[in-house]
Amino acid sequence: MKFYISATGIKKVTISNPGVGIGKGSGGCAAAAAALAARRFSSRTLLLLLLLLAIVLPFIFVRFAFLVLESASVCDSPLDCMGLRLFRGGDTSLKIGEELTRALVEETTDHQDVNGRGTKGSLESFDDLVKEMTLKRRDIRAFASVTKKMLLQMERKVQSAKHHELVYWHLASHGIPKSLHCLSLRLTEEYSVNAMARMRLPPPESVSRLTDPSFHHIVLLTDNVLAASVVISSTVQNAVNPEKFVFHIVTDKKTYTPMHAWFAINSASSPVVEVKGLHQYDWPQEVNFKVREMLDIHRLIWRRHYQNLKDSDFSFVEGTHEQSLQALNPSCLALLNHLRIYIPKLFPDLNKIVLLDDDVVVQSDLSSLWETDLNGKVVGAVVDSWCGDNCCPGRKYKDYFNFSHPLISSNLVQEDCAWLSGMNVFDLKAWRQTNITEAYSTWLRLSVRSGLQLWQPGALPPTLLAFKGLTQSLEPSWHVAGLGSRSVKSPQEILKSASVLHFSGPAKPWLEISNPEVRSLWYRYVNSSDIFVRKCKIMN
């Protein structure tokens, strides 16, 4: 090996290695160079490998740590998680979903309080859930348990809110609007100061029509002045021969004065109208006793129904909310609603009538009803609805009666449809030849003996029993009911073609809770030009 060193003043200095032979100089240098290159290559590779490991190992450690933490609730073991991540290249979202589903299904719901209205230890909001999971570092099973309790509590709150909203909606239907109260007061005052409001109804020249069988007699039992005016106005406006109609209004003593004043003042635009108060009837003592007994029994049934609902904290079986709450309406106890069973005694000189409720509006001529052949039956009524034969949602016999009692199950069929009240044709001559009124009283007494458990409160259930087998079915287009419900299910074409629209249900058209989609069908027959209607702001 030789080193050549150059310096100032020295041209060349040569240092020779004595251990290297002259003959081997070129071969020895090549071997030494190869060994030096091999040492340099191995050192560089080792340095790069160490640098790579220094970068990769921390990531592997962190990833493995996460897998170990997840394995407690997701994977069967850390190696399982590593197998999922490293060898399959996927994530654990599918297995997490399966584990979460299993935890939710297996989680018991034994967290209700003694009343079943709450969940112990349940959280109130999503933020509370996040804090709970973050601070306490819960596993997936704990997360499922807490989440399920929270959701159950929220579901109960929603159901409770819906239930209370339904109860309040029904309570709103019990009141009398300020505008109607105003109308009655102003008409009562008008009756006392205006001689025209006190004139005889009908006028003397028309009295003979009250019992003339050649005229079409319509009966209303009502204490609502505005509703009665709409019924008569809509009937007259849609009649081909309005002069053929005679209206008989029966009201209570309280409403007689404003009712008489309204039709006396508006007599020019009305056909023959008779207004009669219950205090003007002179019935035998026997009839008075039966009427009083009838009302007493209906009150007992109503009170028992109310007490049962109160004891159950006004909870309901699904699908029975409407019937249960509507049965609590004070109108179920109103005398005028129960007097229809005594119509033959109210009108002893009439043979055929049409009875209309005060919550109906007439859209076509009713004259052909008096020509309808009842085939020897007493009452003509719509049985099947527009939706088809034996289609009557919410008014099958099972919706009114307690079929667990043998008295009911032996006389009626659960799935049969009850006929609609509100627009009925009565053959009073045929009625007088039956014992319908007495059968009605008999069923009331049987109800008392059976513990008042035979039917829901109201006049219709015992009426259905008394008229069993004496009903003639009419075409469904004559009468469409249910417009006083929360949602009107009848199609628009059915509503337009119906002869009589019945706002049966709590949402009467004169109430604010009425359905705006059908309210206009009733309000178009309100006399908006009348001074009392304007002063009382009824159209507003």
Curated annotation (Swiss-Prot):
Its main location: Golgi. InterPro entries: GAUT (IPR029993), Glyco_trans_8 (IPR002495), Nucleotide-diphossugar_trans (IPR029044). Residues 69-540 are lumenal. GO terms for biological process: cell wall organization; pectin biosynthetic process. The keyword Cell wall biogenesis/degradation applies. Its EC number is 2.4.1.-. This is Probable galacturonosyltransferase 15. It comes from Arabidopsis thaliana (Mouse-ear cress). The lineage of its organism: Eukaryota, Viridiplantae, Streptophyta, Embryophyta, Tracheophyta. The gene is GAUT15.
